[in-house]
Amino acid sequence: MPDKQTIDKAKKDAAEGKSPSTQAGEFVHDEIEKIRQGEHGARNTKQAIAIGLSEARRAGVKLPPPKSGGPELKKKAKQDEERAGKPVSQTRSRARRKAVKKEPTSTVSSEALSKQAKSAAKQRSASDRSKAAKKAARTKGPKERSQAAKKAARTRAKNK
């Protein structure tokens, strides 16, 4: 179950009118931290992200079910929504703790997350990435906008 702090951050994001994916980002960050500390486990980076998104759905974030994935995955996402706010059994909890001890933490290293972010970005079109960057720039203040512009200029120079 996600921490109260994480739920509060997500609620704050919702109150500020941020998108459900931004709200869910809080849960993904929380999940990554838990895996790094050895509280949770994931076999790969995508799984770590999926667990965070699943927790977000359980906490009531209005995330749509994943586009890619069969009916099984969509059914599981629907179950997560239905399980929101229900307690977890002790037996399940004990089994989970035992299983977590065998899981690696390298799946959420900065290198692994960087690799995952790059591969996810490659799947999007250039215009889609550009549109997302412009939207992000609109939501930033002047200082952050300036930093983003400098970073964009560096990237353009590097890619020439």
Give the role of each language-model region.
Residues 1-160:
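A charge-rich, low-complexity, intrinsically flexible signal that marks solvent-exposed coils, linkers
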